[in-house]
Curated annotation (Swiss-Prot):
A family per Pfam: DSBA
MF GO annotations: 2-hydroxychromene-2-carboxylate isomerase activity; glutathione peroxidase activity; glutathione transferase activity
Cleaved signal peptide residues: none
Enzyme class: isomerase
This protein's name: 2-hydroxychromene-2-carboxylate isomerase
Binding-site positions, substrate: 43, 53-54, 84
Example GO biological process: naphthalene catabolic process
Keyword Isomerase found: yes
The UniProt record lists the keyword Amino-acid biosynthesis: no
Main function: Involved in the naphthalene catabolic pathway. Catalyzes the reversible glutathione-dependent isomerization of 2-hydroxychromene-2-carboxylate (HCCA) to trans-O-hydroxybenzylidenepyruvate (THBPA).
């Protein structure tokens, strides 16, 4: 069973969804296909050019409370970073190759940015990530500034737009789409139905 997961490291709701998806992967033997995308470009593509949540103080004040509720429910810390300049670490995702490496990178960066409140554009963050993942630091930093990395990021963002992704986190099971951390219980229900159908077919 494969779930496509679209995220941007600037999104606290993507951080929450990643935690829950990791648990679902263990429970259901789920394969997660990770896709780091440019949320700003995705929103512009559908005409969503209004102010972001962080520019709406009343809404942001509520969201901070709501996010802490979710974090407590999941048993994880949630600390707002100093900024949301996630482009570099989004691009860095495409340095990871195998599925296990991709999952490890996503977990390390999300935990740094939203678990510890480290700014995603902190100059030393790539070195920290490289050390935790056992990567060659200079090779990773070279990749971050390469045209090939930027092109891959742009291609994946365009592919998300073509698939009608309009926000993050977004998850697909087959052709069925769910948007939002609060839709994961619906995704899990669909996964359960699929498991039962497969069991019936094999019996």
């Amino acid at each position: 069973m494969i779930v496509d997961f679209y995220f941007d490291f600037l999104s606290p709701f993507s951080y929450l969804a990643n935690q829950r998806l990791s648990k679902l992967a263990q429970d259901y033997g789920l394969t997660i296909r990770y896709n780091a995308i440019d949320l700003a470009r995705v929103k512009i593509a559908i005409g969503n050019v209004g102010p972001s949540n962080r520019d709406l103080k009343v809404k942001l004040d509520y969201l901070k409370v709501d996010l802490q509720r979710w974090a407590q429910l999941y048993g994880i810390p949630l600390v707002f970073p100093a900024n949301y300049n996630s482009r570099r670490m989004n691009i860095g995702f495409y340095y990871s190759g195998a599925e296990a490496q991709a999952a490890a990178y996503v977990n390390v960066v999300f935990n740094a940015v939203w678990g510890e409140g480290i700014a995603p554009d902190l100059e030393s963050l790539p070195a920290l990530v490289s050390e935790k993942l056992g990567w060659d630091r200079s090779a990773f930093e070279h990749f971050l500034s390469s045209n090939a990395a930027t092109e891959r990021y742009d291609e994946q963002t365009h592919a998300a737009i073509e698939r009608k992704v309009f926000g993050v986190p977004t998850m697909f099971l087959g052709d069925e789409m769910w948007w939002g951390n609060d839709r994961l219980f619906m995704l899990e229900s669909a996964m359960g139905r699929l498991c039962r159908q497969n069991a019936d077919l094999s019996s």
